[in-house]
């Protein structure tokens, strides 16, 4: 796992390390030299090379001055400019035009707001540098807590951050400004990080293998979704769950006609009580609850619509279902902000809202700090929350959180969220712990998009790509670019 520390947590780690006896100037020397080594490597050497370093106040600027000194020791011609003394823009522009590398040491991870004055000018001017642009800890202009950018920000080709990743380097648009991120160990005592970016090995170890004597009912999944004209959603969920390892999937949809449309060769469809309009009716809750204990997981919501009777059925299912539950889409909307049914549950729950569903459920916008938003809802609901969108956050409250870095904008198409719910359901059916089922589900979802290809991607492509994506996860193989 790659630990992630917020700026506040990093400040505490710095103080803890200094209090334990490591002087701040020693930490600064290590940090600056780590930056200098990165610049040297990316320039391809030092002979005849030129570099520009722009420094701000505080530790970030100090790291930049150490990097400049180290580069000079190695024979690089270095031009240093400081924000505190004022940047001679004419001289700086000339230096940038002939530079082989640029070092951004203006602002660190504690930055908030917008760059102005010389800092904003430098952020725009560095595009003239043909060689590497290396940011110290984080590109100047990027909010270290959220990744937000307000106005100008440095576009780095490389970022050397210290001891742990920062949220602003993982969330967009900050991640897009950071380029290739190198984490340099400078001897900071990180304590016990609660946020991390999971890697292949972490996730593979958390996915249970099927026992030699297993049978299909040991890993069964029950899917409840669909309404008139929306039968594709539960079908996507069902087939994704099977591809992710469910031994048998029943797909409950309202009415005989909907059941016929949602059917598939491998998936067993069941017609549930429906209203005259083809929506799930309240008596359906009794049928679902009667069958639920035969299954290892229940996935509820995709395509259900927003009929009041459907919402009543969903609320009862949520409160009374005795098995792990994945609640998505209209299943979340059915709660209408009432978290009581979730808190009443005796079995684990995974919620998978996008930003709009989050508002409906939590009664507030996600805001810029996605990490804090996911953790708040997880604590209030007593559930694992997977907050969808760029930089997916998986949280189970204050205990731990993961940030998924696979996938991309090509997944923003109809039905892909249904596939994600199905993957999580399949992993839960295999016996994965809910937090890890959600984290591995998000990771696999993104990898499936890489297998399927990005341009023109549709939800069905993801399902076809799941076996290869899951196989690469279980075998610890990196996908070829």
Residue spans of the language-model regions?
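Small-residue (G/A/S/T)-rich helix-start motifs and N-terminal tracts that mark the onset
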Residues: 1-82, 101, 156-158, 169-325, ...
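Glycine-rich oxoanion-binding loops at beta->alpha junctions
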Residues: 84-94, 113, 204-209
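Internal gly/pro-rich beta-alpha loop/helix module
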Residues: 100-101, 106-196
């Amino acid at each position: 796992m790659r630990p992630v520390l917020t700026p506040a947590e990093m400040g505490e780690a710095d103080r803890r390390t200094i209090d334990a006896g490591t002087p701040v100037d020693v930490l600064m020397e290590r940090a600056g030299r780590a930056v200098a080594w990165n610049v040297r490597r990316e320039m391809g050497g030092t002979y005849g090379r030129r570099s520009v370093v722009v420094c701000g106040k505080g530790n970030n600027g100090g790291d930049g001055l150490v990097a400049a000194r180290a580069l000079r020791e190695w024979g690089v011609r270095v031009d240093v400019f400081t924000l505190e003394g004022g940047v001679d823009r004419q001289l700086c522009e000339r230096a940038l035009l002939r530079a082989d590398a640029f070092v951004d040491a203006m602002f660190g991870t504690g930055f908030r707001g917008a760059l102005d004055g010389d800092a904003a000018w430098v952020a725009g001017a560095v595009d003239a540098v043909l060689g590497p642009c290396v940011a110290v800890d984080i590109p100047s202009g990027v909010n270290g807590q959220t990744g937000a950018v307000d106005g100008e920000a440095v576009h780095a080709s490389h970022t050397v951050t210290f001891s742990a990743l920062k949220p602003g380097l993982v969330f967009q648009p900050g991640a897009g400004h950071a380029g290739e991120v190198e984490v340099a160990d400078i001897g900071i005592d990180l304590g016990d990080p609660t946020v991390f970016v999971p890697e292949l090995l972490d996730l593979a170890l958390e996915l249970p293998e099927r026992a030699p004597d297993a049978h299909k009912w040991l890993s069964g999944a029950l899917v409840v979704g669909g309404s008139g004209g929306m039968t594709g959603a539960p079908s996507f969920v069902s087939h994704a769950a099977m591809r992710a390892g469910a031994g048998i999937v029943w797909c409950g949809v309202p009415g005989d006609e909907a059941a016929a449309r949602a059917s598939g060769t491998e998936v067993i469809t069941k017609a549930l009580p429906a209203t005259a309009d083809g929506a799930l009716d309240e008596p359906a809750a009794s049928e679902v609850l009667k069958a639920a204990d035969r299954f290892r997981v229940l996935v509820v919501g995709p395509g259900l619509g927003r009929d009041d009777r459907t919402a009543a059925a969903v609320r009862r299912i949520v409160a009374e279902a005795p098995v792990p539950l994945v609640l998505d889409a209209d299943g979340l909307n059915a709660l209408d902000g009432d978290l009581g049914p979730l808190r009443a549950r005796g079995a684990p729950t995974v919620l998978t809202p996008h930003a709009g569903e989050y508002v409906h459920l939590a009664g507030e916008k996600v805001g810029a700090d996605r990490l804090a938003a996911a953790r708040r809802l997880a604590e209030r609901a007593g559930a694992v929350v997977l907050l969808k969108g760029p930089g997916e956050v998986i949280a189970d409250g204050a205990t731990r959180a993961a940030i998924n870095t696979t996938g991309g904008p090509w997944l923003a198409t109809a039905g892909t969220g249904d596939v994600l719910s199905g993957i999580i359901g399949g992993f839960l059916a295999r016996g994965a712990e809910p937090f890890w089922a959600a984290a591995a589900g998000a990771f696999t979802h993104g990898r499936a998009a890489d297998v399927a290809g990005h341009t023109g991607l549709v939800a069905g492509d993801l399902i076809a790509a799941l076996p290869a994506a899951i196989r690469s996860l279980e075998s610890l193989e990196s996908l070829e670019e």
